[in-house]
Amino acid sequence: MAKVLVLYYSMYGHIETMAHAIAEGANKVDGVEVVIKRVPETMNAEAFLKAGGKTQNAPQATPQELADYDAIIFGTPTRFGNMSGQMRTFLDQTGGLWATGALYGKLASVFSSTGTGGGQEQTITSTWTTLAHHGMVIVPIGYGAQELFDVSAVRGGTPYGATTIAGGDGSRQPSQEELAIARFQGEHVAGLAKKLNG
């Protein structure tokens, strides 16, 4: 049975919501085990809550366990066109996995959120760089989700991966179209994982 990990960092809950949609899509594929985990918070609890951080329910992952999965779908908010510091800190601890080639050939995909739309694609593609150094097989979504063709409203979503626009104050929640794109991404990656490892 192929194993898929949805691994995310979410401060305000947008990426957490997207992660659950990704997992929902992945769970549509029979013969795939789907696990949702988050990377550890690096801010102290007081600063996190003072900044408006939302408590997360998913269990924390450890870098070493990444080797246990056939596919990993990474979710991170955009921080100046890059992944969050929390995700960066987590991935910086995977040097041992790199040294042994533990992630080589495993599938990897990325989804993101941004305040105003700036940097979402750059965040995904800059995250790919780290994953490529591990020899992971990058899985974009292309234009497989029909919602990507809908231009009737402002929304996230790119051929690189699912995204959501949170708004400058974080008040905008992922739209139904954005969640549909996320479900597509999860199903797409899980389907490939099953074909390769099922």
From Swiss-Prot:
Catalyzed reactions per annotation: a quinone + NADH + H(+) = a quinol + NAD(+); a quinone + NADPH + H(+) = a quinol + NADP(+)
Q: Which residues bind substrate?
A: W98
Which positions carry the signal peptide feature in this UniProt record?
none
Q: How is the cofactor bound?
A: Binds 1 FMN per monomer.
Return the broad EC class.
oxidoreductase
Its cellular-component GO annotations read: membrane
Q: Which residues bind NAD(+)?
A: Y12
This protein's cofactor list reads: FMN
Q: Which residues form the Flavodoxin-like domain?
A: 4-189
Q: Which residues form a coiled coil?
A: none
Protein name, UniProt field: NAD(P)H dehydrogenase (quinone)
